[in-house]
Design a protein with these regions (language model features):
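Conserved catalytic-core motifs of GNAT/GCN5-like acyltransferases
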Residues: 131-132, 147-165
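Conserved beta-strand-loop-alpha-helix junction that forms the acyl-donor binding cleft
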Residues: 130-138
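Conserved GNAT acetyl-CoA-binding A-motif
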Residues: 120-131
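GNAT-family acyltransferases
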Residues: 1-94, 119, 160-184
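A short, internal acetyl-CoA/4′-phosphopantetheine-binding micro-motif in the GNAT/acyltransferase core
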Residues: 81-83, 94-105, 133
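Conserved acetyl-CoA-binding loop-helix of GNAT-fold acetyltransferases
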Residues: 96-99, 105-118, 122, 141-145
Length: 184
């Protein structure tokens, strides 16, 4: 299997529709999978609006959507929030992702998270926040494998789930050793 990260495009329409059918009654996560998709061109336009921060609903932030594909098969979806507002900083974080049910257990979630983290670094996000439900132990392990450190746990109002809030610290690329005295 050779996977690559792509931007949403018409080329993957049938695979996207098959992915949605395969999800059945599961929660469609990240949120882009829950958008109306009967008019696929309109869906692509809406994702482009999210990418560019144009005509997005109140409370949302500009968000990049990435698809992990194997050939012409859509196997995973990630969303990268380009910055955090107060609500998303509290519960949501920068990255959300999901893997197609028939492709789970193959390490693709880890791959998708790693390449989405690379995309976050490319746009200048230094400290990356990734949150998951405490009951989703596989996601917690995946976040830790990708450098995440558990910062806190949060219980939201009447919601029964505890949210674990992880942070991937900024890479320490700014450290430059001082030259030794007398060296050129």
């Amino acid at each position: 299997m050779t996977v690559k990260l792509v931007l949403p495009s018409l080329e993957y329409e049938q695979s996207y529709r098959d992915y949605i059918v395969e999800l059945g009654d599961e929660e469609r996560y990240p949120f882009q999978l829950d958008l109306e998709h009967n008019d696929f061109c309109a869906l692509l336009e809406r994702l482009d609006h999210f990418l560019n921060g144009v005509n997005i609903p109140s409370g949302y932030v500009p968000t990049s959507t990435f698809w992990l594909v194997d050939g012409h098969e859509l196997v995973g979806v990630s969303s990268l929030r380009q910055y955090l507002n107060e609500a998303i900083a509290e519960c949501g974080g920068h990255i959300g992702l999901g893997v197609r049910p028939s492709y789970r257990g193959l390490g693709l979630g880890n791959t998708l998270m790693a390449v989405t983290i690379q995309e976050a670094r490319k746009i200048g996000i230094e400290e990356i926040h990734i949150h998951c439900h405490k009951s989703n132990e596989a996601s917690g392990r995946m976040i830790v494998r990708n450098g995440g450190v558990l910062r806190s746990e949060l219980k939201l109002g009447q919601h029964p789930e505890t949210v674990q809030r992880y942070v991937l610290p900024a890479p320490n690329n700014s450290f430059k050793p001082k030259p030794l005295r007398g060296s050129a």
